[in-house]
A protein has these predicted regions:
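Juxtamembrane "helix-exit" motif on the non-cytosolic side of transmembrane helices
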Residues: 58-70, 122-132
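Membrane-proximal helix-loop-helix units in multi-pass membrane proteins
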Residues: 98-156
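Non-cytosolic membrane-interface motifs at loop->transmembrane helix junctions
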Residues: 69-83, 130-143
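Alpha-helical transmembrane segments in multipass membrane proteins, preferentially the mid-helix core
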Residues: 23-30, 93-94, 147-166
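Aromatic-anchored segments of alpha-helical transmembrane domains
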Residues: 50-59, 113-125, 175-187
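Membrane-interface transmembrane-helix boundary segments in multi-pass integral membrane proteins
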Residues: 4-19, 171, 177, 192-235
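Hydrophobic core of alpha-helical transmembrane segments in multi-pass integral membrane proteins
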Residues: 14-33, 47-59, 179-183, 228-240
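Membrane-interface helix-boundary motifs at transmembrane edges
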Residues: 31-44, 99-107, 158-169
């Protein structure tokens, strides 16, 4: 099974990234010109499929001895595996945003889901690198994140959301509300069912930029205050790129 081994920036890994990009293009081509209701049903259906796949993936982790040894010395805890992180919370935010046509939610998912999922695909933790894609732990990790990239980008390619700088304040508000909500869930779980709960990494994380933030503001939740500034800069850059692309498409051929 070595030929299916997934290591960042090696053959199978690069092929997976290529297939992810191809899936975005294929969905666009298949649904281009189709009624909005059909496009909506399709995207929501893909999201629900991914949510079911995510549930199966997490169930497989509860039976994975290597994963449990690495992350749960006191035993597996499903309450630390819920889809409430910055990336996988979009498993249900994307279909909710499409169903309600909520630009704040769709905007958040468009900007955050592909970025967060792509970072997970490009820079996996050691236990998710160098193993066969046929292992449930590896298959679930890479495929669920790849589909998140596809669904997040499809919000734009299928016409549900076009990046607009006027949306950014509302998206930042959505981000803030989700972060506070995640922290409250962390507090509740730490007092009851899951002492290590750390959704949205509100208690810090061994990630370079987050460790830097913690050194600046060593307080749970509050240490992430610089994050909205970085997110805003990223969103404004994407909006500017989108506007340039739109102008190029609208320009008459000379």
């Amino acid at each position: 099974m070595n030929e299916f081994s997934i290591t960042p920036f090696r053959g199978p890994h690069l092929l997976l990234l290529l297939l992810t990009a191809a899936a975005v293009l294929l969905i666009f081509l298949l649904l281009r010109g189709k009624p909005e209701a059909r496009r909506s049903r399709y995207l929501i259906g893909v999201c629900f499929f991914n949510l079911a796949l995510f549930a199966g993936y997490k169930l497989s982790l509860s039976l994975d001895a290597a994963y449990i040894r690495a992350y749960y010395p006191n035993g597996f805890n499903i309450f630390n595996e819920l889809p409430l992180h910055l990336c996988n919370i979009n498993l249900f935010l994307i279909p909710l945003g499409v169903w309600k046509r909520n630009r704040s939610i769709m905007g958040f998912s468009f900007f955050v889901a592909p970025l967060g999922a792509l970072m997970a695909l490009l820079f996996p933790e050691p236990l998710f690198s160098g193993f066969s894609l046929l292992m449930p732990r590896i298959f679930g990790y890479y495929v669920t994140h790849a589909i998140l990239v596809v669904c997040g980008l499809s919000l734009a390619t299928l016409g549900f959301y076009r990046p607009d700088p006027r949306d950014i304040p509302r998206i930042l508000k959505t981000f803030g509300l989700l972060a506070v909500g995640a922290h409250l869930i962390n507090l509740l779980l730490r007092l009851t069912l899951c002492p290590e709960a750390n959704y949205f990494f509100t208690y810090g994380a061994e990630i370079g930029v987050l460790k830097l933030f913690w050194r600046i503001i060593p307080a749970p939740l509050l240490y992430g205050l610089p994050a909205p500034l970085i997110l805003a800069g990223y969103m404004y850059a994407v909006c500017a790129l989108s506007r340039l692309t739109q102008r190029a498409e609208e320009a008459p051929f000379s």
